[in-house]
Amino acid sequence: MQLSQIAQKSGVAAAGFVVAGMLAAAPALADPEGLDFGQKAEIPSPGGAIDYTVSTLEPSGHNDGVWYSDVTARAVSGSPTPNIADFNARAVNSSTYAVMKGDKPDGLPNQPLTAGSQATGRIYFDVRSGTAPDSVVYRDAGGTDRVVWKD
């Protein structure tokens, strides 16, 4: 009887350690990947995957509250389309600015890329009445921050 109780307690303790180990090893799903400007991040996209590189974040220079980022999208697999609407600029106070809608002559093309090809262009943010942004965030369709680029 004594041996049975010891074995039972040992089994419960071992199961507890296994669960604790699994929880400790699980990645934090809410934490976005943090990168410096100029680094790339691979992001799944409808039709494949894209390596995005955000190189800059700066005011347009026209004193109009518009900021821009230079972005390169390279198709890693399939024929994905860059999802420009998933980019946002963010300030240190958490103010978030959506990308401006509409095609721009120097904008990042919103069309499918063939595997291995890339496109480079600008994405623009309307920051007219807010705090200057310091980062660019890629937020998926579910509203989860996936990647944050900043200096």
What are these regions (language model features)?
Residues M1-A30:
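Secretory targeting and sorting signals
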Residues A30-F37:
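Cleaved targeting-peptide boundary
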Residues R122-V147:
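Short, surface-exposed ligand- or partner-binding patches at beta-edge/loop junctions that are enriched
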Residues G65-S77:
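Short, well-ordered beta-strand segments enriched in hydrophobic/aromatic residues
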Residues I50, W67-S69, A119:
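Hydrophobic core residues within well-ordered beta-strands of beta-rich domains
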Residues F37-D64:
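Low-complexity, acidic Ser/Thr/Pro/Gly-rich terminal tails and inter-domain linkers that flank the onset
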Residues R74-A119, V148-K150:
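The feature marks short-to-medium sequence segments in extracytoplasmic or secretory-pathway proteins
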Residues E58, A75-S77, V127:
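Beta-strand elements of well-folded, non-transmembrane domains
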